[in-house]
């Protein structure tokens, strides 16, 4: 099968990676192929159904593939690790999709690499299918994200903390896999030439309009800050908690990447944490905008020598960008919140209106997704929100203020903005448990709902319901891919 690879990272950035083959697997089996994505990439899904097990397991890569493990560093929970890199993943190449966009193809769970740091480099079935589900859920919500092209069972059992688990490999598609940590890897070694080469490559690939800017590296820094501020605002608007916002998990492209311990919040609480390794709550839901700024500061540090030859002026320029991050984020968040609330135009008191609703939701632990979805019904039915709030009077003072700001077509706009289906934790776990037992039908049904999250259907009612009371209080997520 022809993939039409054009591997610019391997060609232009020698020394930024290690050539490495995928580990052999005993009995690969294609579990799921993302046919719409395959077509978007200009690939033949029918051929991939037949040949995908061999290709996406790494056992028989297509002509032109160039498997490599990328080098990067990163701050993990605030502590700097000068060498991380692809410890269980291989970039196999780049292709141009039907829209003319360059896309990376990466195998996750393909075995040890020189960056594995003692791990086996493999991925278990559950985490692979989880990333597939959540990535497609984010895509359905219109949030920039890496996506899953395929999931392959390897036929190899893996020993994990919870016992023996079947092995699997995810084929991930991304605008690129360049991270804040990629810049940090070379900056930590004072290799300014490679920092510059990486910046030039990233500009050419993601922000080509900046190449002719008076200060292209400063403009690049601003562009990444803008892309990430918009991304994190969109996470917050749907109640998404990434769970591991390390600098090696922040892309230059502005896509969501690495879904290991992520989850969607149900009852609204800014302190919500699901990740089993986030013991201090560093990456809690409400902290994500602050970590956004912290991570961008680390990118600024890596770029300092490119911003100006004078260290003081370079620091001033980086600071001038960082000082805009809060306003950038707030602007995107407020614009999104106005849409979620169905407001007409923009008025000065809109932020307070939104914050007052959130405070009422917090005090009642109201379900994030259903509250905003049922607001569309509350345009004409005051009782629509009562089942979601323990205190029926919680919104008594807020509702008249909100109604006074509504656009004429508010209900219709709100239903197109506020999803009815998200990847609720208990439904994801049910789908994964069934998959472990050999039944992928629940996975398929959930995936179908998540691909169309704004269209409410009677036969999907179960996917809209919150978890049983107490489920999320003890629910924990893990870094599995």
UniProtKB/Swiss-Prot annotation:
| Pfam family membership, one | SelO
Report the top EC class in one word. Answer: transferase
Residues reported in the UniProt entry to bind Mg(2+): 249, 258
Q: Which reaction does it catalyse?
A: L-seryl-[protein] + ATP = 3-O-(5'-adenylyl)-L-seryl-[protein] + diphosphate; L-threonyl-[protein] + ATP = 3-O-(5'-adenylyl)-L-threonyl-[protein] + diphosphate; L-tyrosyl-[protein] + ATP = O-(5'-adenylyl)-L-tyrosyl-[protein] + diphosphate; L-histidyl-[protein] + UTP = N(tele)-(5'-uridylyl)-L-histidyl-[protein] + diphosphate
Sorted alphabetically, the keyword list is: ATP-binding, Magnesium, Manganese, Metal-binding, Nucleotide-binding, Nucleotidyltransferase, Transferase
Function comment: Nucleotidyltransferase involved in the post-translational modification of proteins. It can catalyze the addition of adenosine monophosphate (AMP) or uridine monophosphate (UMP) to a protein, resulting in modifications known as AMPylation and UMPylation.
**E.C. no:** 2.7.7.-, 2.7.7.108
- Cofactor(s) for this protein? Mg(2+); Mn(2+)
- NCBIfam families of this UniProt entry? PRK00029.1 (NF000658)
Q: What is this protein called?
A: Protein nucleotidyltransferase YdiU
What family name appears in the similarity comment? Belongs to the SELO family.
Indicate which residues the UniProt annotation says bind ATP. Answer: 85, 87-88, 108, 120-121, 172, 179, 258
Q: What are the recorded GO MF terms, alphabetically?
A: AMPylase activity; ATP binding; magnesium ion binding
Q: Which residues form the active site?
A: 248
Q: Which InterPro entries match?
A: SelO
Q: PANTHER family per the record?
A: PROTEIN ADENYLYLTRANSFERASE SELO, MITOCHONDRIAL
